[in-house]
């Protein structure tokens, strides 16, 4: 009986550890992420960041994106990270893609979090219906998620 209880407790601890290790999926290839969003009928969250130099971006990551609340909430959307680092190397393809998206939406500051509803048109092109944007919100994940949820409720 003790062996059975011990085995059960070990299995429970291992499964709890694996659950806590689940990470949020951040896409960096915009086209692939948009296809996933359309296929799964989900909205998209673009995160414009300077991951290695922007203090507010790092603070947003720490206080919101690295929390269990955000991990749970993030299943509602497809996450895309558009990074503009100063010391981390990126491929030219990623740099060009990120700059194109930044110019397309007129993003001028970091962090910027932009929500869109992607729509595949009859000609195969994808229209990105802008729902709204935010950035760092003081008050932690609860306050930030309240702002994000209010933006996601908007429809075009």
Question: What are the language-model segments listed below?
Answer:
Residues 1-22:
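Bacterial Sec-dependent N-terminal signal peptides
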Residues 21-40, 149-156:
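N-terminal leader/targeting and pre-domain segments
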Residues 24-27, 49, 70-96:
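Thiol-based oxidoreductase modules, predominantly thioredoxin-like and allied folds used
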Residues 40-52:
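Short active-site neighborhood of thiol/selenol oxidoreductases, capturing the structured segment around
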Residues 45, 54-58, 113:
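The canonical Cys-X-X-Cys-His
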Residues 51-54, 84-89, 108, 120-122:
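Solvent-exposed loop/turn segments at secondary-structure junctions
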Residues 56-73:
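Typically the conserved alpha-helix immediately C-terminal to a functionally engaged Cys/Sec
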Residues 63, 100-156:
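Non-catalytic, surface beta->alpha helical segment in thiol-disulfide oxidoreductase systems
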């Amino acid at each position: 009986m003790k062996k059975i209880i011990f085995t059960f407790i070990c299995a429970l601890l291992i499964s709890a550890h694996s659950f806590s290790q689940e990470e949020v999926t951040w896409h960096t290839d915009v086209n692939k992420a948009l296809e996933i969003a359309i296929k799964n009928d989900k909205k998209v969250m673009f995160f414009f960041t300077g991951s290695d130099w922007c203090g507010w971006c790092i603070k947003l990551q720490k206080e919101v994106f690295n929390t269990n609340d955000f991990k749970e909430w993030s299943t509602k959307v497809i996450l895309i990270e558009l990074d503009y680092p100063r010391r981390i190397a990126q491929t030219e393809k990623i740099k060009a893609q990120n700059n194109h998206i930044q110019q397309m939406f007129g993003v001028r500051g970091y962090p910027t979090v932009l929500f869109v509803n992607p729509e595949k048109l009859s000609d195969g092109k994808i229209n990105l219906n802008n729902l709204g944007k935010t950035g760092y919100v003081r008050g932690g994940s609860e306050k930030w998620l309240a702002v994000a949820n209010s933006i996601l409720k908007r429809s075009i």
